[in-house]
Amino acid sequence: MQETAIRYLGLFGGDASKQALAELYASSSDVQVKKAVLQSFMVSGQKARVLAAARGEKSEELRKSAIHLLGVMGAQTELWEMYQAEPSVEVKKSILHAMFVGGGSERLTEVARSEKDPELRKAAIHSLGVMGDRTGPVLLSIYASDPDRDIRRQILHALFVQGNVKALIQIARTEKDPELRKEAVSHLSHMGSKEATDFLVELLNK
């Protein structure tokens, strides 16, 4: 009942309701209630309050919930500022996912290219893959310029996730590392497209 009332206030309440929700968030120790209030903040466009929770909440679960909501709200600038200041790798992964939710391919590309932590680079590359083949040229560019085999493997998987047959064929034709070439061919064998099948037949006939 309480969470239903919280959702109602977020959808239909005025300034007094917003203030009541803020006071409830500050006074409650119930994580589920706080999550419901954060959701209401998001629905009613109270970005500053969601941002305050994302930055200052002691509960990592609530921080991650607020960060996700910032992604839904399209708060790319605020998320990027948080990412640069955040020491926790796990929280940074949540920020990257929120950037993905908000369609922030530009910042994800920046992380995929230049982040020093390999796990965060891989997370950014994965998100770029899930965003569809419009990020294919970026992924190919990173693949061509980065000699790290693990990063290249992550890019191959991202290209597979987005169904980018052309990019995988290009890599399978030109890659000199036999393991990576084999991996590209393996991805193509699971894609079920005519173009991929034709390429695999071509390989068999060589």
Summary of predicted features, one role per range:
Residues 149-192:
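Ankyrin-repeat and related helical/solenoid repeat scaffolds used for protein-protein interactions
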